Amino acid sequence: MTRYKAIISYDGTLFSGFQRQSQARTVQEEIEKTLQKLTGGQGIQIHGAGRTDAGVHAYGQVIHFDLEQKRDPEKLRFALDTQTPDDIDVISLEIAADDFHARYHKHFKTYEFLVDIGRPKNPMMRHYATHYPYPLDIAKMQAAIKDLVGTHDFTGFTAAGTSVKNKVRTITAATLTQDPKTGFLVFTFSGNGFLYKQVRNMVGTLLKIGNGRLPIEQIRLVLESKNRQLAGPTAAGNGLYLKEIIYEE
């Protein structure tokens, strides 16, 4: 068996998420169906570094899979890229070490979240940025976002009912900028792992701080109390992008 590692991007608008689900269109299912065609009917399972939700996009998702026959990586990449649906792009593909695992090999992820603060909103970007038409103090949010950096228990920022027991994660960078061309707000978070809906809950809280409905100290309060009820609402998934995954050597 030969293990392959690929970097893929996708428009999440018409997907019910990355992970295979019954009676729902997913990124995993589409790639596995294409691999099955390319291998003459073999059942191939792919493994992703992250399980993005419905409507969430990716610039740099990483997957791995095993094939019985060794294939030329570029020819395989081209075949996958041209035979998967148009909302999936196979950026690169290479032979990986036998013990490489896209999800469990130690890595750092970067997520980006776009917020359209225009009044009126940009209808062409409705699937690619979350609209927030209310007044915002950007400087306030830029000050508050710094409290997320470091190693914390992020229980207060994860969705209820998550099965993950250890909710301690490290965020190495958290920034908020404004795109000079579009005027969109760009939230960027990098870290060693993120809990279910963590990024969307952090953005929802920051927007509420910027709107003056939560104090600037609320991020610290949520982290210290581990109370989801003190955080803001979950921001919509359409503004979220899995931007990059970097593996340790």
Curated annotation (Swiss-Prot):
Name of the protein described by the UniProt record: tRNA pseudouridine synthase A
Family annotation (PANTHER family): PSEUDOURIDYLATE SYNTHASE, TRNA PSEUDOURIDINE SYNTHASE-LIKE 1
Keyword Isomerase appears in the UniProt entry: yes
TM region(s), chain numbering: none
CDD domains assigned: PseudoU_synth_EcTruA (cd02570)
GO biological process, one term: tRNA pseudouridine synthesis
Binding-site residues for substrate, renumbered to this chain: Y111
UniProt keyword annotations, A-Z: Isomerase, tRNA processing
Enzyme Commission designation: 5.4.99.12
Reaction equations catalysed: uridine(38/39/40) in tRNA = pseudouridine(38/39/40) in tRNA
Alphabetized SUPFAM superfamilies for the sequence: Pseudouridine synthase
Pfam families in the record: PseudoU_synth_1
Family membership: Belongs to the tRNA pseudouridine synthase TruA family.
Subunit structure: Homodimer.
Described purpose of this protein according to its UniProt entry: Formation of pseudouridine at positions 38, 39 and 40 in the anticodon stem and loop of transfer RNAs.
Enzymatic class: isomerase
Keyword check for Cytoplasm: no
A single GO molecular function term of this UniProt record: tRNA pseudouridine(38-40) synthase activity
Active site: D53
Gene: truA
